[in-house]
């Protein structure tokens, strides 16, 4: 139960932070490109790396609490791209270059394809 509360609280905070970033990016830079999403994905990757490195260095008690609150919750709510980035980085560190390339390309291509499939289905169902 405590794990669910940590993930939920972190996820709520991350989602609000992403929303506010998107609002500010739109206000500052305009609607010409998805600046908010781009920034959230890059910042989320950076923060996930910082968290993973910090937790690996620190170790010990409380590590799982911080991982759940910040890694799974806050960064998961801010962007799932941060978790994806960590997974690719771990593959590269293990020298699994082919796997990292396939996962990177496949994740992006299939996510975009799935989005289009969902749009197509929604348009047919709700037309």
From Swiss-Prot:
Residue numbers binding Na(+): 76, 79
Record's catalysed reaction(s): fluoride(in) = fluoride(out)
GO molecular function: fluoride channel activity; metal ion binding
Subcellular location: Cell inner membrane
Keyword Hydrolase carried by entry: no
Keywords of this entry: Cell inner membrane, Cell membrane, Ion channel, Ion transport, Membrane, Metal-binding, Sodium, Transmembrane, Transmembrane helix, Transport
Activity modulation comment: Na(+) is not transported, but it plays an essential structural role and its presence is essential for fluoride channel function.
GO cellular component, one term: plasma membrane
Keyword Transmembrane helix in record: yes
TM helices/strands, residue ranges: 3-23, 36-56, 72-92, 101-121
Membrane topology designation: Multi-pass membrane protein
GO biological process: cellular detoxification of fluoride
Domain of life: Bacteria
Similarity-based family: Belongs to the fluoride channel Fluc/FEX (TC 1.A.43) family.
UniProt-listed PANTHER family: FLUORIDE EXPORT PROTEIN 1-RELATED (PTHR28259:SF1)
HAMAP family: FluC
Summary of the function given for this chain in its UniProt record: Fluoride-specific ion channel. Important for reducing fluoride concentration in the cell, thus reducing its toxicity.
Name recorded for this polypeptide: Fluoride-specific ion channel FluC
Recorded name of the encoding gene: fluC
